[in-house]
Amino acid sequence: MQKISLLIACALTLAFALGNHMPQAPARIGCAWPLSTCPVCLKPLGATPVIKIIDDPKDPSLNGREIRFESEQCAATFEIDRAKYLKPANEQMVREQLPQYPAINCVVMPDESLTDPNSANAGKGENIIVGNRLVRTCCGQCARRVRRDPVKWLAQVDKGIVADQGAKYPLKVCVISGAPLPSEPVNVFIGSRLVEVATPADALKAQQNPIETLAKLDAAIAALKPSAEKKPSTDAPPIAKPDAK
């Protein structure tokens, strides 16, 4: 009986230990999927897309990257040939994120300058996507370093975005909750854009639907601008009264 009890105790201890060391799904790195379409079928993503986070510790450039699909079938097809479906998606992300990318030097070698992100030559450098976000580097060697540790180098991009967009951020209220922004708002990065929100809970909501969040941001910014400049009057000027004699 003692042997049986000992075996049961050992089995329970082992099960508990294994339960505590079950592999956890990777945390999302970077931002939520910023495109409106599925990378496999290219159909628009509905209100309830299938959300997957790549679990591949052997490839840090992909591990933790969120992908959104139109269906579970598309998610399964994606796993057969990730590179095939990510290539055009990455190219689209580069095109969309370049205009807002901060005017900073290479994040790996800060002494090396890059072309203006808004210039015609901006797309000809080493532009890579990690965690659904653009990182520009001066050379292929630096690009490889970014792929090996995306979190480290995305943090440098974040600093550049805050320095570039934070000072001129036009809103005083949170686009998610409508609450006034605190003196130190929570920064959310969607692609190369900064969204300031009031609380960490608002930050989570902002990433749930990044396209909708950016649409709200753009609408709020547009509402701050004058509706239209007054058109010059086409009426004839009033006739001046003659001077009294």
For each feature predicted by the language model, list its residue ranges.
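Bacterial N-terminal signal peptides
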Residues: L7-A17
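Positively charged n-region of N-terminal signal peptides that target proteins for export
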Residues: M1-I4, K245
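Intrinsically disordered, low-complexity terminal tails/loops enriched in metal-binding residues
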Residues: L18-K245
